[in-house]
Amino acid sequence: MADSISGTPLLTQPERLERRLKDIPAEPGCYLMRDGDDRILYVGKSKTLRSRVRSYFRSRHDLSPRIRLMTRQVCEIEFIVTDSEAEALALESNLIKNHQPHFNVLLKDDKKYPYLCITWSESYPRIFITRRRRFRSPLDRFYGPYVDVGLLRRTLFLVKRVFPLRQRPRPLHQDRTCLNYSIGRCPGVCQEKISSDDYHQTLRKVAMVFQGRSDELQNLLQEQMHKYADRTDYESAARVRDQLQGLDQLTADQKMSLPDSSVSRDVLALACDERLAAVQLFQMRAGKLVGRLGYTADAAGLSPGLILQRVIEEHYSQVDAVEVPPQLLVQHPLPQQSLLEEWLTEQRERKVQIHCPQRRQKADLIELVQRNAEFELLRAKQGQEQQALSTEDLAQLLDLPLPPRRIEGYDISHIQGSDAVASQVVFIDGLPAKQHYRKYKIQSSSIRAGHSDDFMAMAEIMRRRFRRWARAKADGLDLGALRQKGGSALQTDGLNDWPDLVMIDGGKGQLSAVMEALRELNLHDDLNVCSLAKQREEVFLPGESQPLESEADQLGVALLRRLRDEAHRFAVSFHRQQRGERMKRSRLSDIPGLGAKRVRDLLSHFHSIDAIQLASVDTLSKAPGVGPVLAQDIFNFFHPTDENDGLPSSQLEGEQLEHSA
């Protein structure tokens, strides 16, 4: 706040960041790096905060490309001092778990593995499979990820047969239970036939299945069955017996087991070259393989032990204590092994040991995991080569000097002008970079229900997307120099998103509208732009009347097609979301002058929107709180004319007076 005190000159963003670097203490703790929009980019820990944070900004040549990209976006640094490095590690894991910073995702998931979600925050939690790991509440839990989605579906199907669970997201009937309750598949949560506490108790047993604690659950159910039998409650004992039999069927589907069946452990190994590492994590519970996770990681300048350590830090910061096994087997010694053991022990509240095994049985297990990692590394490298060939082919097709690294795709979605939105999707090195996706609501008053104009909408999005760059150019800044520096926050005030190529979903018309908007911004000579028409997959360039000569199956066109399809998917999903939200609101709330109270009064007086729509101006004006002017506005809303479409009567009266004058 000192910068804003009267008489003190305001500091520029680079000066504030440089001053912040000088203020960081030489103590253990955590640091949070934020961008110009106050988003947390990265959370880290260190035994000495000052030296660690400053190392990011001294010489970037020693940093990996991923971290260099991150430092260019940093506009603010926060720090939290702790008493020890172990305390800093625990705090770091909590911060990462809560904020999910993009650059803390050291690992790239090989696939979009599915999770099992239990919404513990609800009175009657739901249980379902999802590929989106988004926490709606800190109480909700995700179990997984699971490599075999087929096995996960079968397991969930059997679980719902063994345990009576909520079957539907919403009740089928408002006043009675459905067939699932009658056949014992559901405990009747919609009519509260079971208390919330009892339902949570059932679901805690289900969670044990997905935590790899089937043996523990089996012992618990056997104890319950004997207690019911001792009390001569044979019906309840029979129900638990059936659950035990179903649990046996669940655990029989494991495909791999080890001789030491009493041990639960995670096994980590990797295969790497100078740039890329493939990491495999096998989850063994009671000697059985219950899960396998495969990732690729940035390996530039990192030792194998350090890569495994970062995998451990990030993976176990995302899981519950019950999912931390008592033992970890790792392929290489870890730089801070004792510190990690202390952190995991504190998280699990029981002893956790990390071993780098030498004895044959455990070493053979490490070798098995490493072989899987080698296959994944080969597959990842082949994928990278394919992506590189695609961008090279695209550069040749469009006559670009270099293969485009950052490509942006845009699309418009609406229904006859209503709920008009646009999408911006970004591919980096040929792959979707979803953290850079953006959504736009079309703001032009000319585009509304019954009045659509895709050209105008696309031009509007270009103006909004590139206006910061246009201002920078108008201020005399060299855009080429800004792009070369990658938008370093220390020198360019946070500009860091210049695309190597912009692709528009559409033909010559949409492309012409975009180029006209870029001419207004004086950026038409700075940006590479093309469009992809839907029908024949034709590629157009600005100023060209004919499409480029290309084949629909060539790599560059296929890359544009994937980008176009992703932009279309993202735009349509946002449009559906906006339309759904609008439809949830009463149509009356769109009428100027009608607040929440008047809407309630109108509905109370007329009993339905249909009755309001059929009412005359005179009838409307007699409703409580509605005068002649507002009655006319309501009537005009439901009975638009070409001249009066959607305009309030007060505005119409002003226009008529002006015209008569």
From Swiss-Prot:
The organism of origin for this protein: Synechococcus sp. (strain CC9902)
Job of this protein: The UvrABC repair system catalyzes the recognition and processing of DNA lesions. UvrC both incises the 5' and 3' sides of the lesion. The N-terminal half is responsible for the 3' incision and the C-terminal half is responsible for the 5' incision.
Record protein name field: UvrABC system protein C
Main location as per UniProt: cytoplasm
Origin: domain of life: Bacteria
GO molecular function term, any single one: excinuclease ABC activity
Keywords: Cytoplasm, DNA damage, DNA excision, DNA repair, Excision nuclease, SOS response
Disulfide bonds: none
Residues covered by the GIY-YIG domain: 26-105
GO biological process: nucleotide-excision repair; SOS response
